[in-house]
Amino acid sequence: MELKDIQMRLRESIAESGLQQKEIARRIGVSAQTVSKYMKMDIFPALDTFAKLCVVLDVRSDYILGIEKY
């Protein structure tokens, strides 16, 4: 899995959530600018923040990461 694939899945999940970046940021405890950086893959969230992000977006972390087999 390449970063561009993670980026695509993250962007799709955010779009499908119907939430604004500002609201996502508020719910996971970061700034809207930080969420924007996640979407551009400038930075990747810390594990605990990534877990919160997945909960807020109602998406499985293995989907975002492209993990198909364990």
Predicted segment positions?
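A short, Lys/Arg-rich alpha-helix, primarily the initiator
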Residues: 1-19
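Short alpha-helical "recognition helix" segments of helix-turn-helix
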Residues: 24-25
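Recognition helix of helix-turn-helix/homeodomain-like DNA-binding domains
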Residues: 29-44
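DNA major-groove recognition helix of helix-turn-helix
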Residues: 39, 65-68
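DNA major-groove recognition helix of helix-turn-helix/homeodomain DNA-binding modules
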Residues: 48-63
